[in-house]
Amino acid sequence: MTMTDPIADMLTRLRNASAAKHETVDMPYSKFKANIAEILKREGYIKDFTAKEAKVGQTLEVTLKYGPNGERSIQGIKRISKPGLRRYAKSDSLPMPLGGLGIAIISTSSGLLTQKECLDRGIGGEIVAFVW
């Protein structure tokens, strides 16, 4: 069976693994997912990620990050633009999740960026997800 929204699947796996206090989570690999993982690592939401060879294709292994008392670094993660309803924003109307405490991942012509990077460059794009 084919997956309709592999990005939503990735975000759900991260949300569930974080809630269950798992150390790592595996998912099917794609460049887009690796770019999302790169942003999450750069912003401090995950420890690391690696691409591994599997029986069929590759898998993306994400190492989750927790605080000193076991508190989750990913409190919430939500898919915004979905296959049935795409959401776009101009550079002057980009969202600020939780008043700037979270990040919005934006797909632009320059690749995946956070809303802060989009504001600096003055570009808009498709709002992929919110993370806080």
From Swiss-Prot:
GO biological process annotation, one example: translation
Pfam families on file: Ribosomal_S8 (PF00410)
Molecular-function GO term, any one: structural constituent of ribosome
Keyword field: Ribonucleoprotein, Ribosomal protein, RNA-binding, rRNA-binding
Gene Ontology cellular component list: ribonucleoprotein complex; ribosome
InterPro entries (UniProt xref): Ribosomal_uS8, Ribosomal_uS8_sf
The keyword Calcium is annotated on this UniProt entry: no
Superkingdom of the source species: Bacteria
UniProt key word Transmembrane: no
Oligomeric and partner information: Part of the 30S ribosomal subunit. Contacts proteins S5 and S12.
Family according to the record: Belongs to the universal ribosomal protein uS8 family.
Role noted for this protein: One of the primary rRNA binding proteins, it binds directly to 16S rRNA central domain where it helps coordinate assembly of the platform of the 30S subunit.
Protein name (database record): Small ribosomal subunit protein uS8
Species: Bifidobacterium longum (strain NCC 2705)
